[in-house]
Amino acid sequence: MQVVTTIEEVRAARRQWAEVGFVPTMGFLHAGHLSLVQQSKAENGVAIASIFVNPTQFGPNEDFASYPRDTPRDLALLEAAGCDLVWMPSVEEIYPAGFSSYVEVEGVTAPLEGARRPGHFRGVATVVTKLFNVVQPTKAYFGQKDAQQTVVIRQFVRDLAMPVEVVIAPTIREADGLAMSSRNSYLNAEQRAAAPVLYRALTAAQTAYAAGQTDAEAIRQLMLETLAQEPLAQVDYVSIADPRSLQELTTIDQQGVLVSLAVRIGKTRLIDNLVM
């Protein structure tokens, strides 16, 4: 496994391969990331991963400085997963002095996470565009856990005619249903025990829908009641939305509705979703 830091090194290595799969990460890897790397390797023959904690997608009072980092562990996990090349650029490599170009996606960035994290998706869209430009992947792999992010990425890839296939893989969960996330490491034992309430709220919604409930507001209320049973859970939002436009629904009259939520447990903000 090669480990490189510069754009030039990535481009030089990329020339030897016809097809590559790409998994962009912010490091502190878990089984969800590694499953993407394994899928990338299986489908393309070559897997490239990046590790870059992207400062432009963090707000001024968010956790950029404290975001968990463990490079030696990450590299060992990537090698074991069959990764061929790891790109670990510096902030200066991605955003050199004088950098002043950003990718702004309208519409789908407005609700949900976008409404609560101003500038977040501008940072995501800009860095992913630059990573794609450098790596030139055949396919790029993302997890369904960051549902709005997947919609945003698919939007700009389509709008800007980027020659990459975006593959969305199912959320990988702990045994108790908690979606795997690097930020789960912030939770203490009591908070970790409370965190599966997000998945319980999602499964309550799914069960109600399967039983014939199509009133979106009734399902939102059911989710809020489920979350209210956990004293440590502070609800940011619950959403039942169209999976493409991300606009809230009043009636569920279609397959593939996106049910999502954001909840604070202590100081840690967790997100999760399912498509029903």
UniProtKB/Swiss-Prot annotation:
Q: Which sites bind beta-alanine?
A: 57
Q: Name one GO molecular function term.
A: pantoate-beta-alanine ligase activity
Q: Matching Pfam families, A to Z?
A: Pantoate_ligase
CDD domains, from UniProt? PanC
What UniProt keywords apply to this chain's record, in alphabetical order?
ATP-binding, Cytoplasm, Ligase, Nucleotide-binding, Pantothenate biosynthesis
Major location, coarse class?
Answer: cytoplasm
Give the location in the cell.
Answer: Cytoplasm
Task: Specify the pathway.
Answer: Cofactor biosynthesis; (R)-pantothenate biosynthesis; (R)-pantothenate from (R)-pantoate and beta-alanine: step 1/1
Oligomeric state and interaction partners are given as: Homodimer.
Query: HAMAP family attached here?
Result: PanC
Q: Which family does it belong to?
A: Belongs to the pantothenate synthetase family.
Instruction: Tell me, in a sentence or two, what this protein's role is.
Output: Catalyzes the condensation of pantoate with beta-alanine in an ATP-dependent reaction via a pantoyl-adenylate intermediate.
**Name of the protein in question:** Pantothenate synthetase
Per the UniProt entry, what species is this protein from, by scientific name?
A: Herpetosiphon aurantiacus (strain ATCC 23779 / DSM 785 / 114-95)
Q: Provide the taxonomic classification.
A: Bacteria, Bacillati, Chloroflexota, Chloroflexia, Herpetosiphonales
Whichever gene encodes this chain, its name is: panC
